[in-house]
Each structure stands twice: as structure tokens, then as C-alpha cells.
A protein has these predicted regions:
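Conserved, mostly hydrophobic/aromatic
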Residues: 6, 18, 36, 43, ...
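Structured C-terminal cap/extension of enzyme domains
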Residues: 44, 49, 68, 188-376
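A general structural detector for well-ordered alpha-helical segments in enzyme core domains, enriched
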Residues: 2, 35-39, 62-69, 98-102, ...
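Glycine/proline-rich, positively charged
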Residues: 27, 87-206, 213-220, 226-227, ...
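N-terminal binding-site loop/beta-alpha segment at the start of enzyme catalytic domains
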Residues: 1-78, 135, 141
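Structural motif
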Residues: 42, 46, 105-106, 143, ...
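Short catalytic-loop micro-motif centered on adjacent basic/acidic residues
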Residues: 50-56, 146-150, 173-174, 247-249
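Structural motif corresponding to the early beta-alpha repeats
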Residues: 57, 73-92, 117
Length: 376
């Protein structure tokens, strides 16, 4: 296993981290507890030193199962991270209330990282008003939390705002993969975190599995390259070549995924990507993106629409279906129609187009996607 170090806090981790939001489930959709525990412990026995969970994962049951998995001496072997559900926090006191509830679920007196979950500009406003820094000082003084951090879903400007708001962040958790190097935190945001000594933990390294099972045209790009690796290996290699990345989370849901990831990371060394490899990644990205229509980043500057059209939901859902080369969006669009948020509500005011930082022809895209999604 490739071992790593969080720079400012001088804490050892592993390049592979176990994300606990996609555990195996039983036919009645409950966590297969015995299998999940077996998977976590096998990963730890083979060098994984970072475990990531959160308050809402698996309907609130992920933390309970993680707590059970970390019995019998396993807790002391890992960095344990869970997250404050900031969207549920209404008062300063709520922060400690949620932390105490989560510690009870995890059956541990402390967590290593307690991070603000899914932060964006709006949530940062709320956390500042509720004095999140004072909460962390209290939780750390009481021995319940070792280090603060945040996970993130917004644009690059918002990321830098949150990153620069405090010099005590121990880590940041961001979405990054071959397709998202210019989305959300962006590569430059990751580099700025590195310059500030804030360790980067990557989520969605394979875009929810999308990059693990590429369509035929993307697979052909990989197959034409001189060195043969699986798409999963290529996806992880892109990330662990980044010196700022300390841990890459994988939401493993099967024993096979655990063993395959352990195999990949057992062989991993931080490479310096060659010009040929960088060109390969650019070609893979371009081939994926050529399948999409809108390339909407989900920034939501177009929202709210005066007619209630959920533009990012439509655009990102459609593009995702095109990336997967399937027809699943039709069912999703039917639900958007049922919500009265589909493109037929558009009155062509073009308020959205004036607000779009990508200068997308939103009205035209809405018409074309509506036609494609409602055709017999």
C-alpha cells in the first residue's frame, strides 16, 4: 500500500481510503452488515488507513456499521472521518449535538477528522454566522475531534473562499477525476490547498463508476495506448500522481472491488506522468465530452428560473446518460415533467442565458433535449 502523510498535522494515511456510502445491501435494501465489516477489516489488514463515513449515509446506518467494524483493535489503526450535516444545523449548539450523536453511533470517544459536509457558498455563510471555528475549538478541547476539515460541492471561487477562511483546516475533500479537473474545486484549487499545507482527499475518483466501465469509443483510446492498464487503474493513476492528493476514497460495495483496489494500490507509486500519458488523458476526456451536449457544470447561476425549470437537473442528467451511452434519461425526464420543472415550462425570457458563466445556449438546449426525451 502506498503510504502518505497529511502535511500540516503530520499524520500518516494510505493512498486508498474506504468510502462507506455504498456498502453491500440485502434484498430489503439494508446494509449487509457482516459482509461490510468483513470488507472493511480486510482492507485495513492490507494497509488501508483511512475510513470515511457521514451522518446521512445508508439512512444513518453507515456510522453504526463502521463503529462495529472498528472494534477488536481496528479503531486504533485508522484515521476515522465523519461529517457534520451542516444543512440540518440551525444553532451553534446543534453542532455539538450532532457530533455527540455520531460519536455514540460510531461507539468511539473521538474522530480524527470531523468535517463540514458538502460545503458551498450558502452553507459557508451559515457556518460563519454560527461560529464554526468556536465549535471546533470546543470539540477539540473536549477531545472529541482531532482535526477540522470540509468536503465541497460548488465552484472554484467558493472553494477558495472556504479554503482561505481558516488557517487551521487539516484536510479538504473534493470531487476530482479525469473529467472534473476543471469543475468544482478544479486542479488549481487542489494546488492552492497543497500550497497551504491542507491535505486533499479525493471523492468520486471514478465518477460514481462511470470511468470504470467506459463506452466503446473511450475503451478504444485506452486499448490503442502502448501500455495496457484497466480503466480503473488509469483513473486512479491520474489522481495519485498529484502530489497534493493524500488519500483517494473508493466507495466499495463488493468484495471484488476491495481486492481489485488493494491490488492496484499495492503496486502504486507516485509517478510523474509522461507527456504521452497526459495526452492520453486529454484524449480520453475529449472522447467522453464529445458524447455530451451541454457540458453544464451545475453551478446553478441560472437558478431560480422564473418558471421553475430545473435547468442543471435536466442538463446534467442528460449529459450523464450520454456519457454512459444509455437511454436512462427518458425515465428521469418523465419525473421532471411530473414535477412541472421540464423544458416545456420555458417562456424564452433568456434570464438564464444572461446569468450563465459558460455562455451556454440554454434555451436551444432545452428545446432539443425536450424533443429527444419525449420522442416515441
Amino acid at each position: 500500500m502506498l503510504n502518505t502523510m497529511f502535511p500540516t498535522i503530520n499524520r500518516e494515511s494510505s493512498m486508498l481510503g474506504f468510502g462507506c456510502m455504498r456498502f453491500p445491501t440485502t434484498p430489503d435494501c439494508k446494509i449487509d452488515e457482516s459482509e461490510a465489516i468483513r470488507m472493511i477489516r480486510h482492507a485495513i489488514d492490507n494497509g488501508v488507513r483511512y475510513i470515511d463515513t457521514a451522518y446521512p449515509y445508508h439512512g444513518g446506518e453507515s456510522e453504526v456499521v463502521v463503529g462495529k467494524a472498528l472494534k477488536d483493535g481496528y479503531r486504533e489503526k485508522v484515521i476515522l472521518t465523519t461529517k457534520l450535516p451542516v444543512w440540518l444545523v440551525k444553532t451553534h449548539e446543534d453542532m455539538m449535538k450532532f457530533l455527540d450523536e455520531q460519536l455514540k453511533k460510531l461507539d468511539t470517544p473521538y474522530v480524527d477528522f470531523y468535517i463540514l459536509h458538502a460545503m458551498n457558498n450558502e452553507r459557508m455563510d451559515a457556518m460563519q454566522k454560527l461560529d464554526y471555528k468556536r465549535f471546533y475549538a470546543e470539540a477539540i478541547a473536549q477531545g472529541k475531534v482531532r482535526y477540522p476539515g470540509f468536503s465541497f460541492h460548488d465552484d472554484a471561487k467558493a472553494f477558495l473562499r472556504i479554503l482561505h477562511d481558516w488557517d487551521q483546516w487539516g484536510m479538504c475533500q473534493v470531487q476530482m477525476n479525469i473529467l472534473d479537473d476543471e469543475n468544482q474545486a478544479t486542479l488549481e484549487g487542489i494546488r492552492e490547498a497543497g500550497r497551504r499545507g491542507v491535505g486533499v482527499v479525493v471523492m468520486e475518483p471514478l465518477r460514481g463508476g462511470l470511468l470504470a466501465n467506459p463506452p466503446v469509443d473511450v475503451k478504444a483510446v485506452y486499448d490503442a495506448y502502448a501500455v495496457q492498464r484497466s480503466p480503473v487503474e488509469w483513473g486512479f493513476r491520474y489522481l495519485y500522481a498529484m502530489p497534493e492528493v493524500i488519500t483517494i476514497l473508493s466507495g466499495m460495495s463488493t468484495w471484488a472491488q476491495v481486492t481489485d483496489n488493494l491490488r492496484i494500490f499495492d503496486m502504486a507509486k507516485r509517478p510523474t506522468l509522461t507527456d504521452e500519458e497526459l495526452a492520453l488523458y486529454q484524449k480520453v476526456k475529449a472522447t467522453y465530452l464529445a458524447r455530451t451536449k451541454t457540458r453544464c457544470t451545475g453551478c446553478k447561476y441560472c437558478q431560480p428560473c422564473p418558471m421553475g425549470v430545473q435547468i442543471p437537473r435536466i442538463f446534467q442528467g442528460y449529459d450523464a446518460a450520454m456519457l454512459r451511452a444509455d437511454s436512462s434519461f427518458k425515465a428521469g425526464y418523465a419525473q421532471i415533467q411530473a414535477d412541472h420543472a421540464d423544458a416545456s415550462q420555458c417562456i424564452h425570457c433568456r434570464k438564464c442565458e444572461r446569468a450563465c458563466p459558460q455562455h451556454l445556449p440554454i434555451t436551444r438546449f432545452l428545446e432539443e433535449i425536450h424533443a429527444a426525451s419525449t420522442a416515441e
